């Protein structure tokens, strides 16, 4: 193994104007991992690079070289800085060769890897998070029909509207307290005041999404309740949101309100972020047989993609933007 020395990485960063100096930390005698760390940085926040060569398998005699970049980031879940919270994002590259590989073959692996990492293909894949390249790779070789190119995912914000869409349910304002909290009911009841219909600045097809980009991996559907990176929609579980547990945990802004009139019902309402109003959960439940879909968009400050499990949803990670009724398949 070469002597572990200081490594200077120049011409890095988006504009190629940054330099990173890495000082050797040493080699772990147990696993042979060589480690370097950013010079002059606070230990908890320094960048680190590790290089390791795995032990060869008994039969195949394969060696694997792994280069890993560790970028510690101090942040909280809501995106604010907090030096006491450290999260490490890893980027690693692994390539292998056998003990029978010649010097020329190993040198070719090194130079080929460097050229690949500098290619526009990888730069675009990383910068644009572009999922289209599997299609291009398939189309570039082999036989058979060529699949259509896949359009990349959209930004995490809602797409620009191509029209208008009005909420299919009555919408309400719940500001004035009708009854204060009690010992058995630790939340207030509000006066529900019906509002004039409000339009979303998107058309229905925008909310459901063009399948060529919104559903690019075919997992975003009513049945799988799976989000696609930052954007997605899910079948709303209005039954759960109407429970006392949902009122207590307040993962979403749910309020109890009394509808107008002497015989007005007391119901629970869910807040819709896009139109700044509330919608009755009983209305949503009544239409559920026909198919109710709630549109979600990830909040840019949440730092996380849409979860798999509905119970992990909350108003920060997945704010409810819109309620739309669509036929069930």
Curated annotation (Swiss-Prot):
Gene Ontology cellular component terms for the protein in this record: viral capsid
Outcome after substituting residue 191 to S: In strain: QB_3, Qbeta_3_FR
Disulfide topology: none
Subcellular location: Virion
MF terms in GO: structural molecule activity
Keyword annotations: Capsid protein, Virion
Main location: virion
UniProt signal peptide: none
Domain of life: Viruses
Matching InterPro entries: Levivir_coat, Phage_RNA-type_capsid, Read-through_dom
Pfam families: Levi_coat (PF01819), Read-through (PF16814)
Phenotypic consequence of residue 207 to R: In strain: Qbeta_2_FR
Effect on the protein upon substituting residue 182 to A: In strain: QB_3, Qbeta_3_FR
Effect of residue 34 to S: In strain: Qbeta_3_FR
UniProt keyword Ribosomal protein, yes or no: no
Keyword DNA damage part of the UniProt annotation: no
Role played: Minor capsid protein.
Extra remark beyond the main annotation: This protein is translated as a fusion protein by episodic readthrough of the termination codon at the end of the capsid protein. Readthrough of the terminator codon occurs between the codons for Tyr-133 and Trp-134, thereby producing the readthrough extension.
Name of this chain's protein: Minor capsid protein A1
